[in-house]
């Protein structure tokens, strides 16, 4: 009972609880925040005012500069110098005369900006289009300072067809190269005469090349029993049947082919044949070593001298012929060369000039 009376007396002392919907009073905090924002606004206004004043000054400065400097002419400094020199009667001008010409004809050079003078001197002294002339000892040169400048003869083409316009950076004058011997794209002059030469191998007719392939195929498919002048005659007739460009000029001696283009009758190349006017087919001067290439026998090397004959290998089957026709002489054909000593002997006794055979021995 004593505990309950103590609790009741404490509740009576506290009194009933009251719920108030009003917000607590935070007036002191609000005052501090208002003062803080007011200070920030004052600083911002001061800074913006200063920025606006600076921008006004900058705009006024730019306006002054834009009013002082005129628009630059649509020409490069090289073109301006060339114009000043070309307007002179003697096509020669000093640096002072170039300055005066530019100031008289262009408003840009009459302003307060003086940096263009350095650009004129720089382009005048470093460009290959302008030549500095030495001083002469005469009355006209007495008391005058500076050298005269003129335009180089190799750069006069720049003055034609809008040559005064600005060119890309790093431009240099191109020197013209003349070739007196060549009169056209497909002509060559030799000794005062002009000869045409084929621009490409496609100018040969298809009929001539097809007839050559057919004749060679028929000869090789016969088994290679008859090797003599008949084969060479057929091959030469087949090659000459193709339409090839003429090597004989009008009223000129026969021209023989050589390694470097056209030969002459007085100085023909050693391997050029006086009988035929077109190169013949020959085996390249290459020797093989059997130790370095196992399975392949050494191939003979044929050095053409005066004989225009072409000796095909003895091939008996059509399949081996097609393989050799596509990929060159095979190992079997090379072996046929080695085993055909009697064939070479027969050719020698027939009255033809023997072709030297050089075998590379290891």
Curated annotation (Swiss-Prot):
Where is this gene product found? Nucleus
Q: What happens when the gene is disrupted?
A: Embryonic lethality; those few animals that survive to adulthood lack functional embryonic and M lineage (mesoblast-cell) derived coelomocytes (CCs). RNAi-mediated knockdown abolishes expression of ceh-34 in the M lineage.
Q: What keywords were assigned to this record?
A: Activator, Developmental protein, DNA-binding, Nucleus, Transcription, Transcription regulation
Q: Which GO terms describe its molecular function?
A: DNA-binding transcription factor activity, RNA polymerase II-specific; RNA polymerase II cis-regulatory region sequence-specific DNA binding; sequence-specific DNA binding
Source superkingdom: Eukaryota
Instruction: Give start-end positions of Acidic residues composition bias.
Output: 37-57
One GO term of the biological process aspect: nematode larval development
Which residues carry the record's DNA-binding region feature?
72-169
List every stretch annotated Disordered. 19-70
Name the Pfam families on file.
Forkhead
Q: What is its main location?
A: nucleus
Q: Which SMART domains match?
A: FH
SUPFAM superfamilies, A to Z = Winged helix' DNA-binding domain
Q: Which residues form a coiled coil?
A: none
Listed PROSITE patterns: FORK_HEAD_1, FORK_HEAD_2, FORK_HEAD_3
Gene Ontology CC terms: nucleus
Free-text function comment from the UniProt entry: Transcription factor that is required for cell fate of coelomocytes which are non-muscle mesodermal cells. Acts in concert with, and by activating expression of, the homeodomain gene ceh-34. Binds to the sequence motif 5'-ATAAA[T/C]A-3'.
What is the name of this protein? Forkhead box protein F
Organism (species): Caenorhabditis elegans
Q: What is the lineage of its organism?
A: Eukaryota, Metazoa, Ecdysozoa, Nematoda, Chromadorea
């Amino acid at each position: 009972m004593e505990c309950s009376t103590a609790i009741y007396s404490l509740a009576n002392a506290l009194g009933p609880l009251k719920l108030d919907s009003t917000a607590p009073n935070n007036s002191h905090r609000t005052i501090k925040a208002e003062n803080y924002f007011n200070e920030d606004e004052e600083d911002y206004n001061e800074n913006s005012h200063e920025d606006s004043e600076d921008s006004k000054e900058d705009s006024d400065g730019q306006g002054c500069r834009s009013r002082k400097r005129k628009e630059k002419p649509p020409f490069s400094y090289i073109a301006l110098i060339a114009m000043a020199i070309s307007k002179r009667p003697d096509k020669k001008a000093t640096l002072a005369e170039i300055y005066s010409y530019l100031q008289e004809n262009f408003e840009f050079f009459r302003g307060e900006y003086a940096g263009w003078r350095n650009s004129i001197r720089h382009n005048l002294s470093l460009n290959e289009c302008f030549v500095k002339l030495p001083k002469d000892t005469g009355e006209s040169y007495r008391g005058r300072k500076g050298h005269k400048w003129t335009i180089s003869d190799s750069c006069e083409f720049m003055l034609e067809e809008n040559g005064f316009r600005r060119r890309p950076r790093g431009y240099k004058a191109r020197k013209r190269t003349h070739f007196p011997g060549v009169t056209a794209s497909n002509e060559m002059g030799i000794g005062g005469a002009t000869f045409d030469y084929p621009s490409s191998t496609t100018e040969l007719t298809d009929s001539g090349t097809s007839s050559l392939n057919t004749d060679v195929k028929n000869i090789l498919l016969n088994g290679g029993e008859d090797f003599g002048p008949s084969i060479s005659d057929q091959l030469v007739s087949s090659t000459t049947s193709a339409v090839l460009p003429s090597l004989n000029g009008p009223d000129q001696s026969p021209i023989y082919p050589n390694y470097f283009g056209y030969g002459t009758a007085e100085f023909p190349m050693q391997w050029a044949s006086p009988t035929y006017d077109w190169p013949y087919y020959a085996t390249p001067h290459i020797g093989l070593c059997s130790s370095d290439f196992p399975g392949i026998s050494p191939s003979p090397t044929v050095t053409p001298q005066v004989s225009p004959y072409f000796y095909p290998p003895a091939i008996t089957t059509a399949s081996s012929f097609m393989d050799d026709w596509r990929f060159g002489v095979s190992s079997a054909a090379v072996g046929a060369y080695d085993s055909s000593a009697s064939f070479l002997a027969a050719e020698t006794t027939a009255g033809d000039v023997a072709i030297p055979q050089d075998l590379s021995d290891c």
